[in-house]
A protein has these predicted regions:
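Positively charged n-region of N-terminal signal peptides that target proteins for export
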Residues: 1-5
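Sec-dependent N-terminal signal peptides
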Residues: 6-14
């Protein structure tokens, strides 16, 4: 007969790193260990102070802003004129106030995207805002943003793309120019532009790495403090076998910004998609085949599951590495227009918040300003409503006044109760209350992520009923349950990697359902025979079988296989199949990482008997008409 054991601990317990026989660490070698030893070691892998700070931020903002804002492209080409960035007005206070009001803690800004265009007053190039007409070439978007962040109490992060199409395409470009590495001083002195920070570095690097390091120095010493450096792994194009001296980058970053996390490297990882999705079990203890603390290149982690027992045993090292879930509030990372470009609903963003933040990850929501330097009104409405829902749902803890171990309700992540497999604890409310959300947290900073399976019961009309089961907890697990009226909750630990340390439990009520419809308004698609495409070379012609009125096309890469990061083309119409009129052109960036439907809206609806798409890498059978 199974006898249930009940936790009776009433006082907070705290763990000390390295105490007893346990060894708590951020990275541990497991090569040659048996399965049981590996799981024991995994239970003691903990975040660094910087990683814990990143998890505690929970909800942060991304801002994509640059020449693409004015060209309507997702990825630039590197051939853009400096004057393409035709900004006349800028309101970073509006950005930061909206971000702060939504409950976000940090802003990450695209100081340089893949096009290589610089959004601050750099000493090391004239391809950037310094050559635009904005404020007579003296404008500095990053400086304005830095000041607004300080004003509104937000942390600042920078996105500095390692890829650089301008430095690839320019005749005098530094990327892949086959320059010889030699010992160079960082930062390189520029007459009339001295640095107040007198730190110097010596690195054996080539031209492009020197350029990148000089700009990192500018950003980290003149716009800080910087809390995150976002190193995107996307590369639209490469040249000359260019490599990155990440050891030098890391040394400079750790010296100048010791509290900054490096995304895309050992500190923070990509969740594996750009659609706001997390794994059902998003473990932050993950396997590596080599020591992640000394690697110079980090591959995207796409596996699902990623940190389960079987996956851990396949590695040679275990490492704590939180996931960021990046997604844009619009169908695209840059603003294109206020007419056709869709904006996510508050239902959708709130759902992603609960699944990502409540799934042991960080939600990074992109908010692209428009060509007037402001957030568009419909984006603001989504952001405002999302923030309101977060506050009204999670700002009130319905377990206040409950009877349970003190450590569970003291809001201190370092105090906790210990729970073994088969044990449980009970939280008794002062009276019956309606709830539909339950939040649990583990003491990951001092003990680690250990819960593998658990269940929660509610006492309803005097009887215990199971209302939820789940897998890992980690930093935070949000359980969304049906509306119930209860006077007690019971947590049951079903499986773990070691003694579990539960640091917090709370209950809440959301007036909004846990599920949502479509994130965007989707045009009604027209039916047509997809076998009617005729393909010759790069030209794909569709015989419409009569006069049809068309508003545009939609490409759905998720239904097929996309080998290319960029798909571009031209759409034309004809009444006889001989004489063609161009009605639109398109360029889809980043289809591999974000395989969501892409809409091409014609300037005006058109009537036609034939439709032609000229593109080198487009499967016409994945096209819809509207």
């Amino acid at each position: 007969m199974h006898i249930r054991k009940t936790i009776t601990i009433l006082a907070a317990l705290s763990a000390v790193a390295g105490c007893g026989t346990r060894k708590y660490c951020n990275t541990v070698k497991i090569d040659g260990d048996d399965g049981n030893t590996i799981i024991e070691k995994a239970a003691d892998v903990v975040p660094t102070a910087n990683q814990l700070a990143a998890l505690d931020r929970e909800f942060i903002a991304f801002i994509h802003f640059g020449p693409n804002t004015f060209t309507g492209k997702e990825w630039g080409s590197g051939f853009e004129s400096s004057e393409t960035f035709a900004l006349e007005t800028l309101d970073t206070d509006q950005w930061c106030k909206a971000i702060k009001d939504a409950g976000m803690k940090m802003v990450i800004f695209t100081a340089k995207h893949h096009d290589g265009y610089i959004m601050w007053q750099s000493r090391y190039t004239d391809h950037g805002i310094m050559s635009s007409k904005f404020r007579d070439g003296k404008g500095d978007v990053l400086k304005d943003l830095s000041e607004s962040c300080r004003k509104y109490g937000l942390e600042l992060g920078i996105y500095l793309s390692p890829a650089d199409l301008y430095q690839i395409e320019s005749p005098d470009g530094l990327y892949g120019n086959l320059s010889r590495p030699f010992l160079r001083t960082i930062p390189r002195e520029v007459e009339g532009r001295p640095f107040s920070n007198k730190t110097k570095f010596k690195f054996n690097v080539d031209d492009y790495n020197e350029y990148y390091l000089n700009q990192l120095f500018e950003l980290l010493t003149e716009y800080g403090p910087i809390s995150e450096i976002w190193l995107d792994g996307a590369h639209p194009k490469t040249k000359g076998g260019q490599t990155y001296n990440y050891n030098a980058w890391r040394e400079l970053i750790r010296t100048l910004a010791p509290k900054a996390n490096i995304f895309g490297r050992e500190d923070l990882r990509w969740c594996g998609n750009e659609g706001g999705h997390t794994r059902d079990s998003e473990w932050n203890v993950v396997p590596y085949m080599a020591n992640p603390d000394t690697l110079t290149w980090y591959s995207d982690m796409m596996a699902d599951p990623l940190g389960g027992r079987e996956q851990l045993c396949e590695g040679k090292y275990l490492h704590y590495q939180p996931a960021e879930t990046d997604v844009s509030v619009r169908d695209g990372w840059f603003w294109r227009d206020n007419t056709h470009q869709q904006t996510r609903t508050a239902d959708n963003v709130f759902d992603m918040y609960e699944r990502s933040v409540g799934g042991n990850a960080i939600l990074l929501l992109n908010l692209p300003p428009d060509n007037q330097g402001r957030f568009p009104e419909k984006d603001l409405k989504t952001l405002e409503e999302t923030g309101r829902r977060i506050r009204e749902t999670y700002g009130i803890d319905l377990l206040e006044g409950a009877k349970c171990p003190k450590a569970l309700l003291d809001n201190n992540i370092d105090t906790y109760i210990k729970v073994k497999d088969g044990e449980d604890f009970i939280v008794t409310l002062p009276e019956k209350r309606w709830i539909n959300r339950i939040v649990l947290q583990e003491a990951i900073a001092t003990v680690g992520e250990r819960t593998e399976r658990f269940a929660v019961d509610a006492r309803i009309d005097g009887e215990w009923k199971e209302i939820a089961t789940s897998t890992n907890i980690g930093h935070k697990r949000i359980l969304r349950v049906n509306d119930i009226e209860t006077d007690a909750l019971r947590f049951r630990l079903l499986q773990s990697r070691a003694m579990v340390a539960i640091s917090k439990i709370s209950a809440h009520y959301s007036h909004w359902g846990p599920f949502y419809g479509n994130p965007f308004d989707i045009p009604e698609l027209q039916d047509y025979d997809k076998n009617a495409w005729k393909t010759e070379g790069n030209s794909n012609v569709l015989v419409l079988g009569g006069q049809r009125r068309l508003g545009g096309i939609v490409y759905n890469p998720a239904a097929g296989k996309s080998e290319s990061g960029i798909v571009s083309g031209v759409v034309s119409i004809s009444d006889d199949g001989l004489s063609w009129t161009e009605v639109s052109s398109f360029e889809f960036g980043n289809l591999v990482n974000d395989p969501t439907p892409r809409y091409v809206h014609f300037h005006n609806p058109v009537g036609s008997r034939y439709l032609r798409i000229v593109s080198e890498s487009l499967d016409p059978t994945l096209i819809g008409l509207f």
